[in-house]
Amino acid sequence: MNEPEIIKQIIDECKTIAVVGLSSNSFRPSNGVANFMLKKGYKVIPVNPNETEVFGIKAVAHLSDITEKVDLVDIFRRSAEAGSVVDEAIEIGAKAVWLQEGVIDNAAAKRAEDAGLLVVMDRCWLKDFMKYGAETRA
């Protein structure tokens, strides 16, 4: 978990990203990160029961509502809520989970790793993209 090789692999290979907690409020970190993902060519699926659409993309309430294959589940939720999201990510067959900076759930991370998912925890996807992925998705 959190090894540079795993971070690079996720950035390079995970093209369809479900962003859990994505807000339409442009002042929220989830909005800025997801907007950047879109500009870099990633497909973003907003997951938030309080939103109908974000960036003109229809939002879904739960990961289980997504009808296509999800590569990465990027979690912008409180640490206490991350475990159930990780369990959903495992259930839908995601390749990886990313618990954003400040989101920590060691037990959930272990469950994901045990299920074969790549895991990054307590790191910012955007910062890591700038460090590890800028040359691959410019």
Language model: regions and residue ranges:
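Structural/interface elements that position substrates and couple domains in central-metabolism enzymes
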Residues: N2-V70, D74-R77, G83-A138
